[in-house]
Amino acid sequence: MNPKLAHGAQRVEALLQDRSEANAHFFQTEAERLARLCHKMAERFAREGRLVAFGASPSDRSDARHVAVEFVHPVIVGKRALPALGLAGEGGQIAPQVALEAEAADIAMAFGGEPDILAALAAARERGCLTVAFTRDSGAEWEFDLGVIADPLIRQEIAETLYHTLWEHVHIFLDNRGLLEGRAARPVHDSGASSFLYPFLGQQETDLDAILADVKQSILLKADEISALRTQTLSEFAGELLDAGRVLRERLDAGGRLIALGNGGSATDAMDVVADFRTPMFGGPPRRALDLTEDTGIITAVANDIGTDAIFLRQVIAYGREGDVLLALSTSGNSLSILEALREGRRRGMVTMAFVGYDGGNVAANSLADHVFISRSENIPRIQEAHASGYHVLRELVELAEPPAEP
């Protein structure tokens, strides 16, 4: 093997190992507390409370928006939409927004530890909100100290799995409403279409301690699942990631830019990709990048006048140039808006890349991207988490790639 390629492969392996160790340690330590937090959150939702998530930095903004999407638009057919808001810097400072919006029954979830975020948490607690934060000394009622993880990209990946597991398991307690404060007990719960998420749960469980124990085990199982899927994604596609990192570095150094897109939770991943290139958390230089999910005026205009299939296509026509790189994120690989954008990107001479799930969908079957990375799962939260690891590693590999030789 080429020595440079061997070094790159070793780096991918090391990045994977760091993630596996951090994931195992965090969830082994915190699974029981996470189960109890799910119960407390369910009590708030049962009182018609809302989740109010907020973050100030570009990366934290993407997480606030991601967690809101998951609660409002559940991927499990038949599960209720739970009210959630994602507040970010577009509305000004965060603390005044939270002070204006938060209500006593709400759940306040803070991403980041800037003074503005800490002030927002204080305002939420004053209102009577249940408060959750991912940094120490935040003043939140529920703190999960991710600061002990040195790599900021890994911290963000662990946070994503954390809030996915909260969303996945809150529904258990809502289905067992007799376990919620102020609610009459019911003899059975109905996990229905979500039963695949909770393999440890019996259908007539009524004891809180027993359900908490089951939820803890389910959270640990999900932590194992993402570790395995992350390993598959980064190991199977290590060579492809190295090649993509080199090509992306060449295009960026030549004046091109990265253009990212996705739908739903994957739209917030596109936000994060662009944040990682524009304002990298790991100390690398800023790189040119554009988020096609950002301008709601353009998206809604195209959706209204033409149709949702064209929301990215029209923007690729407007912004895409030969020399740019188009990066698509899709859990299914079948979204028509993604397929149309990739086809147009190729017509324009752009390098096309895609992170997909399942078996790769139409993106992989029809070779619609030059570089395809498949997280082989049908579990949408786990796919998104593996994608985050994939594009975070890709971002680091861009800086490890040698710049193109001078002509």
Language-model segment annotations:
Residues 244, 265-266:
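N-terminal, charged amphipathic alpha-helical interaction modules
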Residues 29-47, 234-254:
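A short, well-structured juxtamembrane/interface segment
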Residues 248, 260, 267-269:
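N-terminal amphipathic, basic helical "cap/leader" segment at the start of enzyme domains
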Residues 22, 49-50, 104-107, 254-257, ...:
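Short, surface-exposed connector motifs at secondary-structure boundaries
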Residues 48-59, 257-261:
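Short glycine-rich phosphate-binding loop at a beta-alpha junction
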Residues 56-179, 266-406:
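Glycine-rich phosphate-binding loops that contact phosphosugars or nucleotide phosphates
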Residues 1-25, 182-233:
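Cofactor-/ligand-binding subdomain signature composed of acidic, glycine-rich
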